[in-house]
């Protein structure tokens, strides 16, 4: 690309208008002559040229673009091919006017620089909008040589050669164009002349073009004209010669002149307003030709050769100039470095001169400071560096270790035989075989008793407590020094051998260095003592100073070296290998300590068991436990139940007689009440005796169920102490609970002043055992946690003798389930938190025992005193899956988790989902729920406490990672520090009185229609 480039510092500092350029004269007349300068060549017959009269206009355009384009916005969207834009030319980074010929991709376009004719592919970021005053016709015109066309089938190489040849004839030269015609796209057909040379004829002579046939004329040439876009792309792929790619452009602002008919080169530089304006050195001054002179093709070639030589010389000059500047910079840097070295050398010389004056004093002071430090270090115990404490610890372990005990081995052997004998008795079902096993067990028992006695006596003589205290102190001391031990260390003997070898080597090295230090210091002291004679003027005997003084420098050097070596060994941190050896040994020592501690703990535990065994066996040896007391209780119960039945019949007869006495009936009622209390008192005594026998059976006498099948001990044990054979329904004063009996028989009664419910379960031979087993599992889980279980306790389980019904007795809390509480007086947010924390505790108790509730809903969750939440029991005749298959609803919200709806088995996660829905129902009161397509409620629609909302989201949306224990520890359930829940005494009294009233007056109250379909205690 040639022509005027942008001037970074042009004098034009204001906007420029272009009168006369807005509408260019496109009217051409036949044989009209124009003087133009070639700017770009497309092929052997087509080129672009600028009118020589537009020189100043090109300069103005460049100045304006240099001011406008850097601040303009890059184009976006679809580009208008008719619109003029500003384009950043890649070779000189200057702005020129251009039009978009083709969009190559989303971020690249093919453009033509309209004032020069050349093309380029630009990024969109290099194309900008320009103002309307720059939107006028192009300076350059497209010309086509008259009467010529590109031969059909021309090869690429010949095409490029023709393009290059035409460029050598017209590029940056002033030529005359005789206009013959104009195409519709604006291409001017003209005859080109350079002096006396007909450029078209020269091109045709070279064979790069052929003359059009006379019959076709302009139309034939038009038909041969290639697609301009294809020419543009081909021009990009085959760039024009060197003159088409120069970074400097020829300008027409330079004056023209003649020097004896020869061409002149414009090499002058101009400045304007203090800024550097560059004019080309190599461009030929257009218009310097005498059009009447004889110019030959040889002259043109000579000019071209001069241009190429000039370009080459210019390049060499620039390289030499750059080398010169680089060498000049290097010389300056070397001079600076030399000056810095001189300064540093002078400073060092001054420092040495000043230090030499005090060299001896400074050296002795430093040595004295090091010796003083060495004294302190020698007083400090540095045994840790050589593992002396580990050696001492291993000596302690070896001297008084307890690693084995002969009596313990014998005891464990006999105890194992004893346990096997007990297991055989426990699994025996035949009484005769059982007697044989009992006799064998008793023999082993005698041997065990003797072994226990020997073991106890031997352990009593051992100082176990003292040894354990020594080991604990030793471990604490080592851990304070070495920290955490390595895990997984093996091959203790190899580790200890390496440690002893390393320790010996280090001790020898340290002893050698220490002796060298002491010897060098003694040598220095001896020198000071001997040198006193040399400097003592009172001595008359002649002394040779050279012999007495000796080489003090060598003595000082030796002393300093030895002292520094010992300091380095004492102070510098140990190496990786040393640390590895010490830590491995420490780990082995600690393992031995813990191993012996574990052995002593085993001894003490076995000693405790042996003492207990000996104590109990002294009372039980060769003597079976007595069940007579249990049988007497059963006999007493039998009599009391007979009296109670008789009194019930007597009361019934009196009530049915016509002349019954009310006083006598009341007296009988009191007697019945006393008899019932006596019956339950004896039942509780019976349970206590069963519990004692159960404990003896578990520990010492597994034969009790086999020897005394009549007492039913095995059934009691299998039920976890819940089953009783002494209780019958007709002994209780019951009232039917019809409103709660939609699913099973349900009656209310009172035991020892406490209202209870009797739940009836229809059972047969197959289901009876499963009901007992499920109830026993629930009862055991409740018993493990005791008062903190969060579960509704089970009081008794008994079987009806006349009907296939199993009755379960549980406490009765009238109107305490969540359904009734929310219907009468809804819980506040604080009360709901207390209640749901208790419910979470109940679920945690069940889940810890691997029990899935599967039937959690508002009718079997209770709010006692509106602050204690407990989880009710469930239907023990049903499995987990059967219980979970019932779709309970609360407030229009299903408590069935999404996984249960898809047929998956119930799990702790499904219990937590029901819990979360109940918690949400309590938190939002009567607000309506929005659910997604799976029926899961949307929690975000409600305004809740942040901690409560976080817990609900975890329960409802992310249950797979939640447990009941995590729910218990949720932020919303944690009380602020120093704050407790008050329980006033008056409130307790009121609660007790209300319970008494409810047990008598409200047991037959009807629930509302909302609770009629559920159960208070399912």
UniProtKB/Swiss-Prot annotation:
The Tudor domain extends over: 78-137
PROSITE patterns listed in its UniProt record: PROTEIN_KINASE_DOM (PS50011), TUDOR (PS50304)
Highest taxon of the lineage = Eukaryota
Q: In which tissues is it expressed?
A: Testis specific. Expressed only in male germ cells.
Tell me the gene name: Stk31
Binding annotation for ATP: 717-725, 738
Q: Name one GO molecular function term.
A: protein kinase activity
- Name the record gives this protein: Serine/threonine-protein kinase 31
Q: Cross-referenced PANTHER family, in alphabetical order?
A: LEUCINE-RICH REPEAT RECEPTOR-LIKE PROTEIN KINASE IMK3-RELATED (PTHR48008:SF6)
InterPro entries named among the record's database cross-references:
Kinase-like_dom_sf, Prot_kinase_dom, Ser/Thr_kinase-like, SNase_OB-fold_sf, Tudor, Tudor_TDRD8
